[in-house]
Amino acid sequence: MDRIRIRGGSELNGTIPISGAKNAALPLMIASLLTDDTLTLENVPHLADVEQLIRILGNHGVDYSVNGRRENQDKGYSRTVHFTARSIVDTTAPYELVSKMRASFWVIGPLLARMGEAKVSLPGGCAIGTRPVDLFIEGLRSLGAAIDIEGGYVIARAKDGLVGTRFRFPKVSVGATHVLMMAASLARGQTVLENAAREPEIVNLADCLNAMGAKISGAGTPTITIEGVTSLSGARHRIIPDRIETGTYALAVAMAGGDVMLEGARADLLETALDVIQQTGAEITRADTGIRIRRNGNGISPVDITTEPFPGFPTDLQAQFMAVMTKAKGNSRITETIFENRFMHVQELARLGARISLSGQEAVVEGVDRLKGAPVMATDLRASVSLLIAGLAAEGETTVNRVYHLDRGFERLEEKLSSCGADIERISG
């Protein structure tokens, strides 16, 4: 199993290209199920989750090619991929595929809208009564679907098609907003989604669906209106730059020091996070070509944050921000409001010398002068990269195990950091 070794103490200087956003790519790829024409997506990141979704879509009959060739590229940055679902050969998404990636459950919306039926496994770990998929089920029922749960599968039917509705999300959900927006695109009549997620990835999907012939307005606001159409066509669409990758590398510079240009990054996608990073003492310059971040040797200022839906501070940057706060000059308070159990990185950061106390969904980080390298274990995608950020500023050698988590969401991370002076390498086996 691969691991990554970091020797801390080096500043970061240079240019890092920002890849296409994973959280935008996945729903856009799933949208290919809505049409029998070809959907061409530009700036698709080369990630384990993307490759897994390609396999899942293939199970339903979606063919794909990379720059005109059917292949699974092992190397290369974000690329252009063509997806074609001439016919849906299977409306079942089996457990062995869905269990590997929660976002694959989202195929339920397009399959139901196009074929009138879908049988999709519940994602692994869903407890009855607290399932994250409850919002999806409520929304699809509101569109007229008959839904049963049998043997660990959600079985959805809409024999006469979906019908427009007015649906208010009980709580903001990015995934459920994606799914209902796709499903409602082919429903009869008008659908109004209230308390919808406002994330840039929602806007990116709406723009793509509109290019395919959908009639969607209000994406990026709490109220999205969809006028159903009878069919969608193919389109060519570009995936937005990854705001979480942007924030991650900005935080890496805030931690290690240096001067880095994040090429292709868009500041408007993460203004709140950039403001917070600036408060830690980093200097941020917004440009047409990207974002430049600099930090000299003046130390890191403590900042309190609370994670919130967009446009608030993103939960997907919480772990990385906590890593930076471990070396701040004072105490900081981090409150997680989006997900439960999202402090799994705390124990591993403590192995490096961090001082963090937990109380429910709140963490208090007491900044220390020195972190010391140690072997650590990645527990999930965002936690794993927080350990790398801490390792950049730790004395000696830090080894991060289980880095397959990183490969799910960061394209060639160690190569990008190494090009800016980090002493980092992947060790195979």
Curated annotation (Swiss-Prot):
Q: Which Gene3D superfamilies match?
A: Enolpyruvate transferase domain
Q: What reactions does this protein catalyze?
A: phosphoenolpyruvate + UDP-N-acetyl-alpha-D-glucosamine = UDP-N-acetyl-3-O-(1-carboxyvinyl)-alpha-D-glucosamine + phosphate
**One biological-process term from Gene Ontology?**
UDP-N-acetylgalactosamine biosynthetic process
Q: Which CDD domains match?
A: UdpNAET (cd01555)
Q: Which GO terms describe its cellular component?
A: cytoplasm
Q: Which UniProt keywords apply?
A: Cell cycle, Cell division, Cell shape, Cell wall biogenesis/degradation, Cytoplasm, Peptidoglycan synthesis, Pyruvate, Transferase
Q: What is this protein called?
A: UDP-N-acetylglucosamine 1-carboxyvinyltransferase
- Please give the function described in this protein's UniProt entry: Cell wall formation. Adds enolpyruvyl to UDP-N-acetylglucosamine.
Tell me which residues bind UDP-N-acetyl-alpha-D-glucosamine: 102, 131-135, 171-174, 316, 338
User: Which species is this UniProt entry from?
Assistant: Chelativorans sp. (strain BNC1)
Q: Name one GO molecular function term.
A: UDP-N-acetylglucosamine 1-carboxyvinyltransferase activity
